């Protein structure tokens, strides 16, 4: 079929139907959203939960939500800017931080639902494939599906690091190893050691070592915060191991006290008096004037 030019005449505009607002803004993939939100018709009042992973320049957001007609409802959320209280001060947007954020949201939602003792997940991180097995005499594992939005699903992407953290945290998420670091599309094989190295930030440590040897100025510029905190390449694995254990020990969200907004405002004019204050002021003026007259007459 040859090229057909679209004639934008009256009939074209009369039949034209605009796309959804969030599709016009390039924010939502409705083809994927439909399949992530529609539940089987024989499952009544059972929402389909989604593990939502969103990446920004300075933060990683991981949420567990389900869809309702009035809008999505978030069951639980975790952010990479919470990681400093678990000992991770820098590198809050790399693969290792994404894994920790996924682990945090998994332990947090299971703690909220009272399933954290039944489903501990993978306590020893090896980088290998892990799937949660439901217990025989108890509730099933919490099942959800990965929602990456408009992010590119390339092999080794950070969204899959967050998913791996959630799976190791005890959530039941359908997945394969084909998108984890260490998978080779040519040989169709998966190297778990490469994946484990990414989970513990060893790819960052290797880059730190090579950059320090090749260009010390670039090393000081790119890793200035690491240098300021005294973090070396050999320290990263221990930092992430301690963070994983700290997350498992206490995944709950701590509500920070809001700063008091009691600000003393400057006033450039006189404050308006109430009726009682005005009467008191006039009475004081009268008493002072009478006292002044009496002192003059006595003199």
UniProtKB/Swiss-Prot annotation:
One of its GO terms (cellular component) is nucleus. InterPro entries: Rbsml_uL18_euk, Ribosomal_uL18_C_euk. It comes from the Eukaryota. SUPFAM superfamilies: Translational machinery components. Keywords: Cytoplasm, Nucleus, Ribonucleoprotein, Ribosomal protein, RNA-binding, rRNA-binding. Component of the ribosome, a large ribonucleoprotein complex responsible for the synthesis of proteins in the cell. The small ribosomal subunit (SSU) binds messenger RNAs (mRNAs) and translates the encoded message by selecting cognate aminoacyl-transfer RNA (tRNA) molecules. The large subunit (LSU) contains the ribosomal catalytic site termed the peptidyl transferase center (PTC), which catalyzes the formation of peptide bonds, thereby polymerizing the amino acids delivered by tRNAs into a polypeptide chain. This is Large ribosomal subunit protein uL18. It comes from Drosophila melanogaster (Fruit fly).
